Amino acid sequence: MSYKIVTDSSANLTDEQIESYNVDILSLKYYIDGKEYDSYVKGVPTDYSETYSLLRQKAKITTSLVSREICDAVIKPILEKGEDVLVLAFSSGLSGTYQNIENAAKDYREEFPERKIIVVDTLCASLGEGMAVHYAVKLKNEGKTIEETAKWVEENKLKICHLFTIDDLFFLKRGGRLSGSSAMIGTLLGIKPLLHTADDGKLYVTGKVRGRRAAVEHLIKSVGERGTDIQNQEVFIVHGDCEEEAKYIASEIKKRYKVKKTVYNYIDPVIAAHAGPGTLSVFFIGDKR
């Protein structure tokens, strides 16, 4: 039976990936000065330059979850066409988006009893979630059933490593992860926190280094040290409007570890509102997170 893979905008897939994967996107929303924006609009090239400019000015950006209205607009037409749906959702440890989608899916299962609707809590974020989509699409294209594909994601999602560094401690302070005094001292000393997404799908600080260069080097080395059969993987990278550094990481990963392909993209505004400009992250498959 034919099925469609759906994910949300927090997967941070590039426009090219969305097209080549043939996936549908549930857009999260964000708000600046009371004006509503969609993180993703089908057919409209992604451009977050204005949002990042406002973030650098410390503008307050608020965010919201995937709504029932968005679920109805994206998922119901697929079901009405007679296709099943596999949704790979943003980590429940960071957002209520998964639960909102699952609540909608319960109603769809009653309305379309002949259809299969599977919603997976990926416990992933950004292009880590995008990596789960990447492998799911490969399995689908190989002829795997919706159940087989969902099972693979469930069994392997905790092998998708998410490693981050945040450049501006203001955003950790604003999010309550860092005290004001610690943020001030850390900024003066050039401290850069190192973070990862753990098995519970939440973000934790795992260490710190002095200086941006050391933080970038940590990300690069971690790929080589922790990646499984890394030369045969695709490594994904996201950046908070610091594309040249993302390109540098991609180049070094290819040079040092013979990685065949890397993909990099912007962090969407919903995540950037909490992480800030200058954030960098790498995603790859390891034995564990």
Q: What residue ranges belong to the model's regions?
A:
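Mixed-charge interfacial surface used for oligomerization/domain docking
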Residues: 4, 10-24, 29-35, 94-97, ...
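Class I S-adenosyl-L-methionine
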Residues: 36-100, 106-110
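Short acidic, glycine/Ser/Thr-rich loop/turn "cap" segments at secondary-structure junctions
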Residues: 86-89, 117-121
